[in-house]
Amino acid sequence: MAEVNIIYVTVFILKGITNRPELQAPCFGVFLVIYLVTVLGNLGLITLIKIDTRLHTPMYYFLSHLAFVDLCYSSAITPKMMVNFVVERNTIPFHACATQLGCFLTFMITECFLLASMAYDCYVAICSPLHYSTLMSRRVCIQLVAVPYIYSFLVALFHTVITFRLTYCGPNLINHFYCDDLPFLALSCSDTHMKEILIFAFAGFDMISSSSIVLTSYIFIIAAILRIRSTQGQHKAISTCGSHMVTVTIFYGTLIFMYLQPKSNHSLDTDKMASVFYTVVIPMLNPLIYSLRNKEVKDASKKALDKGCENLQILTFLKIRKLY
């Protein structure tokens, strides 16, 4: 019997967003600016919530974790994507690819359920304001944040281990700008049918369960707002959860576009464009949405800037006085 030599793949090549050389430099510049805004915006929001005691409430506790998750899953994707714009060969080692996939899945799933936790917080704030402090106690808030992190980590670990226990002995070109499950499975020389079923089963459960919590919460919220007689009261209720509504619409709208479009229109290139939006653009938009639409965040930002300017003036005065 003749021996068959099988060469196992240990390094993969990321196809990236574009292969056109004239677009590499402009794309690098655009994504560098977006990533810097993402880092500064989310770190700034986390710091602001930490230092301003007026923002030490359940809503901003969830928001600080949302900013952390946005920062993490953007950082899992964007830096490597930018490197690929300036190098000739966009390679990524086997274990680095596994790490990127695991981190991305962890933080993306966490975001889904954090948005659900925030929707529940809005529901309690508007529909049961008298019982808010009891229903949203510190212990409950910690649980509503800890459960998404733990569940997401376990699901991501499960998927990553199964994906990277498959055999890869053929082509090593991934038709994506990061290591995602479906484009990665296309390269495997093992039977991936069961793995594909698991992907859609878990993705379906995560999206349906988290979006159902969000949708149910907002049905009750809208019903409660419509029962408020004064226009001022309605505006106040809407402003409480307005930023969250915008964030939820953008995030779930993108995921629905990716997973619920007709199969005839579905392609990996379409997925790449949608992936750019929810891995790169949304993490940049979230802190801007909450900063521009939320009066308390704007007031806290103004207070922090005024204090910073005041400290700078005092420091400058002391330096000038020391010189003379």
Curated annotation (Swiss-Prot):
Entry's Gene Ontology cellular component terms: plasma membrane
GO molecular function: G protein-coupled receptor activity; olfactory receptor activity
Main subcellular location of this protein, as a coarse class: membrane
S-S bridge residues: C97-C189
SUPFAM superfamilies: Family A G protein-coupled receptor-like (SSF81321)
Record keyword Amino-acid biosynthesis present: no
Protein name in the entry: Olfactory receptor 8U3
